[in-house]
Design a protein with these regions (language model features):
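Gly/Thr-rich phosphate-binding loop signature of adenosyl cofactor/nucleotide-binding cores
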Residues: 1-73
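Short hydrophobic alpha-helical runs that function as membrane-insertion/retention elements
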Residues: 52, 78-86, 99, 105-113
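Short acidic, S/G/P-rich loop/turn micro-motifs used as interaction or catalytic elements
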Residues: 57-61, 85-89, 182-185, 249-252
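Hydrophobic/aromatic ligand-binding patch that stacks against planar heteroaromatic rings
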Residues: 71, 100, 301
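Short, glycine/polar-rich helix-capping loops at beta-to-alpha or helix-loop-helix junctions
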Residues: 91-97
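Long, charge-dense
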Residues: 100-146
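Cytosolic nucleotide-utilizing catalytic cores of signal-transduction proteins
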Residues: 147-418
Length: 418
């Protein structure tokens, strides 16, 4: 994980005599490591997110320092602390350097020579370690609750960790499923994976860190935004998704918060190419297992409807289908109800299935069906006659119409995961 630079500065500026002289708008950067650098040649070893400390021992002039800072910015470090009083003084920080840091939102701090670099780095390393350990412990415990809710041994290990950090076994929670931040197409599971027990379909996908994830930039951006706005979300990261878990709140508030996150991610990263599914509120902590399935299903629905986010509560009939673990039962129902029409269309190169669907939607109105299909009323009458006489559909029977519409809904549900 990482620490918000603003929080770090606020908590330690007095202890180490830190003075922020430029780049204040960049205090919302995340700091994931501390790195001591005196040589621009070492910048190639940086990964991004480091807080750099330098004494400027190799600094020969203002141009050297300017280019050094420019290189740090290009390598996406989060800020620079200059240890002044030995090799560099406050007067060596030119207006040109300050303007560069302000323009690039790159925090530049001065630290007195009396502050020992060992002390500040030791402190910051410990903070990073503690933050990482805490985040991983919570994420691992939540992963076990989601993946193995019926494993009493794992629950006995996980629940005390969650209690320690504010989670309650009887509290309600929302789970927010965010599709793969790299490629939303890869989020799509098979129907069996989604409806079969989560223990079988997802046993290897949840992890507790951001490492080895091509979408780490956007994931870290999301982390930063959540911390900036002090939102009550806990992260669990998988190989192709990110989960946000929060105390249950109103859908209106969730939508407002998530829409804002999407907006700022689009502004910062130039993309909003992700889909978000929000579960129904759980009955308790163990309910996060079912909430995972709900969130993923809702994210798929968001993708299908080309919408940024979708609530499981709005999935209507699909909410019932998600509880069916045997997908073959659903396929058989579709085949028993619509199979003869599908076969007829394949053999005769026709589209009576769509005509039937529009017939049900339009409540049998020939005029409305013709408008929906962009064809003449006589054509519709002919097709309806085929459905009645050749395909033996009792279209006037309410029970038959209900079964047909149900089959269409199931067919659409299966198509969602195909």
């Amino acid at each position: 994980m990482a620490i918000l630079l603003r929080d770090l500065y606020k908590e330690t500026k007095s202890t180490y005599g830190l003075d922020l002289i430029a780049g204040e708008e960049g205090l919302d950067h995340l700091m994931n490591w501390v790195y001591i650098s005196e040589d621009p040649g070492t910048l190639e070893f940086l990964h991004g997110g480091e807080l750099i400390i330098t004494t400027g021992v190799l600094c020969g002039n203002e141009y050297w320092l300017y280019n050094f800072i420019k290189g740090l910015i290009e390598h996406k470090t989060c800020g620079l602390i200059i240890n002044i009083g030995g090799h560099l003084n406050r007067s060596d920080i030119s207006d040109r350097i300050r303007m560069l840091c302000d323009r690039k939102h790159y925090p530049l701090f001065l630290m007195p020579w009396e502050t020992r670099i060992f002390d500040i780095t030791h402190d910051y390393y410990n903070r990073i370690f503690d933050d990482t350990q805490t985040s991983q412990a919570i994420s691992t415990a939540l992963s076990r609750v989601i993946l193995h809710p019926n494993d009493k041994a794992l629950m006995e290990i996980s629940q005390p960790v969650l209690y320690e950090h504010g989670f309650q076994v009887d509290a309600q929670y929302h789970l927010v499923y965010i599709s793969d931040l790299r490629d939303t197409a890869s989020m799509k599971p098979t129907a069996a994976q989604t409806n079969t027990s989560i223990q079988q379909s997802e046993h290897s996908t949840i992890s507790s860190g951001y490492a080895n994830t091509a979408g780490s930039f956007l994931q870290n951006l999301l982390t930063r935004l959540v911390r900036i706005y002090n939102l009550p979300y806990t992260f669990v990261n998988g190989t192709d998704y990110t989960l946000l878990i929060s105390p249950a709140r109103s859908n209106e508030r969730l939508e407002q918060e998530l829409t804002r996150l999407l907006y700022y991610m689009g502004e910062s990263a130039g993309t909003t190419s992700m889909y978000i599914g929000i579960s129904a509120p759980t009955k308790d902590l163990i309910g996060l297992s079912q909430a995972f399935l709900q969130g993923r299903c809702a994210a798929l629905m968001a993708q299908k409807k080309n919408s940024s986010l979708f609530f499981f509560d709005d999935m209507g009939f699909y909410k019932l289908l998600l509880s069916v673990s045997d997908m073959d039962v659903l396929r058989e129902y579709v085949n028993d109800t619509l199979g003869s029409i599908i076969t007829y269309d394949e053999q005769h190169h026709t589209n009576y299935l769509e005509t039937l669907y529009q017939y049900l939607l339009c409540d049998g109105s020939i005029q409305k069906i013709a408008g929906a299909l962009f064809c003449h009323r006589n054509t519709v009458n002919y097709r309806v006659r085929i459905l009645r006489e050749d395909l033996h559909l009792a279209l006037d029977d309410p029970s038959t119409r209900f079964e047909l519409m149900t089959a269409f809904q199931v067919h659409s549900y299966l198509d969602l995961f195909s």
